[in-house]
């Protein structure tokens, strides 16, 4: 925005292609800022016990599959292969659909961020009777043992010298952990530097 203003003041001609490029950057930055603000607000509500979930019976297999497939084009544009696999066709879970979608988007988006072109992201669902396991596994750069315990910390930016793992504000993963906890579930990561990471969500079928 400031760059365009400066160019206009100097009466510098901007080609339509350049203008479109600058506008795309502005849109992305605006989206990131709005996402950060929303995460800050939600984080505050959760910490103050004022965040309310709207739980209904949902087919978790359909919910996760649709969420992941909606990201398919974005993932493949990065040159990354996407695999979705489940050992159960249908599984009803009492949950807030919007917030579970949000967690899946956060985890898959995180996997994309740290997986190079030619890599693989695999999302799987396993039936554990009274629970369900959702896994987002990537062939990315991985996380060291030392940094695993920090990955869900609020505002933490994980930096591993050997893997150069950067986690931005860290709020996306923090919010995901908080939301899964509100569902009575658990979320954790298994990872090896240079091999990849696997973020695992365990959700109870009924958590009222």
Regions of interest found by a model, annotated:
Residues 80, 184-185:
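Conserved glycine-rich
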Residues 143-157:
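Short conserved segment of the HATPase_c
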Residues 28-33:
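Short alpha-helical segment of the dimerization/phosphotransfer core of two-component systems
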Residues 44-55:
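Helix-loop junction within the histidine kinase core
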Residues 156-167:
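Glycine-rich ATP-lid/hinge loop adjacent to the conserved G-boxes
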Residues 54-59, 76, 81-91, 128:
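Conserved catalytic submotifs in the C-terminal HATPase_c
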Residues 172, 176:
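Short alpha-helical Gxxx[C/S/T] motif in the catalytic ATP-binding
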